[in-house]
Each structure stands twice: as structure tokens, then as C-alpha cells.
Amino acid sequence: RQMCIRDSGNAHAEGYTESPWLDKTCRTKQQIYLADEDTLIRISGYRTRQSHYIMYMAACIFSLGIIGLLSLWFPRWRLRYVYQEADFADAEFVVVENQWGDISKEAFMSVPFARPLKSVFPPTSRDPPCTYAEAQSMLHDAVPDEIRCGHDGEEIVDLLMFEYRYTRFLLHPPTGRFRTIREWRDGKWTSTDLMRQGISTELERERRVFFGLNVIDIAEKSSLDLLISEVLHPFYIFQIVSILLWSLDDYYYYAFCIATISIGSIVSTLFETKKTIARMREMNRFVCSVRVLRDSQWRYLDSSDLMPGDVFDAAEQSLTTVPADCILLSGDAIVNESMPVS
């Protein structure tokens, strides 16, 4: 598939315009423009062809793993021959592709919910934009009445979702397409007086299911996973084959030197990667104590327990960092290079 991009690396491009990606009724493919990241992504649902999977495993065994190694380096081959496209509701996983052609396989999370549909998808909810132009038009367009008033009595049994680069996508059952959690808005957020009431503990538990914790928790691969991914890199596979060939020709000194250098490089890369991930986790994970209005009572909670709709005391002396994106309901604050906000 070719991408027609006006400017290299620019998500404002007119590319990604061919159907069925822009078809709002398609349940196997979907294109979404992420305004916060200025990125276009394409989502496709897949499930396994059992007969093709059996043949693929047999080919891996008879080729001594060469077929499996090639499918690791060229994942599109495996997608084409082992899996088939499926509706999102019936898919085993999704593949996300950005405008630069990078693909990522993301697993589904299915969570028992048994709540009204409008608790996750409020009446103002709608499909995310497919292009930059559509995103700009949605900023000024009102939500259509058929979207605003539809599906009030419907309930969700299981909530189907996945995460891509720490953005959560939820499957909207009536349309069979994904919507981003960041576009969620409480229907009661119509005035500051209603927003000052905060939320209850029951509502916090309900929202925790699809929002998760208020913390950026960067996933950390195990040392074994990092080691395997490093060893299976094409460069090191070439080195391993070279060592075997030199050993067969009795060039043991050459083989030993190359093996020593390769092992040292792999171990060094492993430690450096682990160190970098640990540093990123430490920089991004922030938790502090916050004074929160919960069940009409003020109490101290961890900032990781904050949910959309919570009201917290920003004037608390111990609070030196704002723990979440928020709206100032009363008072004044100095932020962003001493710019006053009221």
C-alpha cells in the first residue's frame, strides 16, 4: 500500500485518502488522525487462518527456523499469508500503521463491564477524525442530533480496547469502530457549578475500568526478551553464520575474536537499553498526595487515583506539580513562564 503524502513527515497531508479507510461503515479498517501527536494511523483487524498457521509452523520446522526468522524481519509477509482481515469485534488482534509505514501489533483487552453504553460513550461521542481537515471541521461543527440522542438504553457486556503508544482506543459496539478515550466528555460538564460537585467512589471505580490509573507507566521488557530481540537482529545473525563458517575452515582465532566482540556488543547494548528504560520510567512516573473532593468530602489520595471529573485542591502547599490536565474552577494561578490564568 502506498501513502500519498504532501510533505514528508507531515500528518497534515492529503494522503491516506483512498477507500475503504475513509469509509465510516467499514468494520475491518479504520483511519484516525491523532491531533495531539499530529499523526495519522491506520487500524486493521486480523484473525488466524488455522490451516495457514499449521503450514507456516511446519515450514518453520522444516526450514530450521529460517522461515520464522524471515517473518520476524518482514512481518507483512506473515500478516499476508498466516492471518486474514476480520471485523474488529471478531478480531484476535489489530495492526496499527502510521504514516511513515511503521507497523505495530496490538493485543485486545476484554474487560467485563455491564454498564450502560452512555457511561463510556456519552451522547456527544462520535467517531474520531480520519484526516487533519476533518479534525479541523469537527472543532466547529455541533454533534448531530442522531448521535446526541442515540443508544440511550443499550448496555455493554464486555468492553473491548487496546493501547497504542499509551493512547487507549475503545470499540464502540453500535458502529463496530474504535473511538479514543481522550475525546470522552461527561454529559454533566455543562457548568462550573455542576463540575464543582466532583464524583462519587462508585463512579470512580466505573471510570477506572476504561481510563486506567492516572500515571504514565512505560512498559519494560525483560532482559531475556531484550537479549533475544538483539541476537535475532540481521547483523548478529550474519555474525553467527560467519563464525560457523570460519570454524568449519579451522579459522578458530578469527571466529573467537568475532564471537567475543559480538557478545560484548550485545551485553553492552542490553545494559544500556535497560538503563535508558529505567531512566525514562523514573522521569515519567509521577505520583503525589492530592486533596480530592470525593463523595462530597475532602480526603487525601494518590494522584494516580484521580479520574476525569474529580475536583482537587490546587492551593495545597505540598502540591508543587500539577498532577493531571485540569480546568481551574476558582482562583488564580501562575503557569507557563509566569502567564496568569484565572
Predicted regions, residues:
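Non-lumenal N-terminal regulatory segments of integral membrane proteins
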Residues: Q2, R6-W298, M307, F312, ...
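Eukaryotic mixed-charge, acidic/polar low-complexity intrinsically disordered regions
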Residues: S303-D305
